[in-house]
Amino acid sequence: MRLVIARCSVDYVGRLEAHLPSADRLLMVKADGSVSIHADDRAYKPLNWMTPPCSLVETPITDEDGEATGESLWVVENKKGEQLRITVEKIHSEQNFDLGEDPGLVKDGVEDHLQELLAEHITTLGDGYTLIRREYPTAIGPVDILCRNSDGETVAVEIKRRGGIDGVEQLTRYLELLNRDELLKPVHGVFAAQEIKPQAKTLAEDRGIKCVTLDYQALRGIESNELTLF
C-alpha cells in the first residue's frame, strides 16, 4: 500500500465531470491497483476513487522551457476510459507498506455459532425455507447463508451479533452482486442479529431487506422466547 499526503487538485473525466480544488489530501494506492482520495473527514469514505482494474501513470509537469516544476500529473484510467486526473503540487509525506495477504474477516464465536444454528434450523426464517449453503462464495466475500424461501426465490442472509449500519451496507453489496446472476435472481435479503440498532433497521427496511432478531439461547434449544420478525 502506498500512502501519499499531498497538496493536490483532482478532476474526474467520464460519464460526468467533477473537480476538487487544490487542498491537502491523502492519496491511497492499494496493491490491487485501486486509487482513492481522502480528506480529513467523511469517516472511511473517499472524496473520489477508481476501482480496479485500472492503470496509474505519473508524469512530471514541465514549464514552457521544459524545466520541471516540481509538480506531477497522475492519470488513473479504467477500462471504460474514465479518468481521475490528479495534479500533485507538493508531497508532504510518502510511505509504502507491504501488508501481505489479508486473512479476511474472522467472526467471533457467537456469530459463527449463530450461522451454524440458523443453517441447521433454516425454517426459523419462515415456513418452506431451504438451505442452499453456508459461506456462499462471491467476488467480494462469502455470504453467511444462501437459501430459498417458500416461493423458491433466493435469499441472502447476513448474520451479526450486533447489527449496525455497516452490516446492512455489506448485505446490500452482496445483493447488488448476486442479483446480476441470472441463475439466482431475484435475490432477497435478510439481516439477522441478536440486536439490531434502530438506524440499521430503518436503513434495511428502506432497501427492502427484512430484519430478524435472533435469540441465541432459543436456537441452542434452551427455553426462551422465539425469534421475532419485524
Curated annotation (Swiss-Prot):
Protein purpose: Cleaves both 3' and 5' ssDNA extremities of branched DNA structures.
Entries under NCBIfam families matching the protein: PRK03298.1
Species of provenance: Corynebacterium glutamicum (strain R)
Superkingdom assignment: Bacteria
GO cellular component: cytoplasm
Enzyme class: hydrolase
Name of the molecule in the record: Endonuclease NucS
Keywords: Cytoplasm, DNA-binding, Endonuclease, Hydrolase, Nuclease
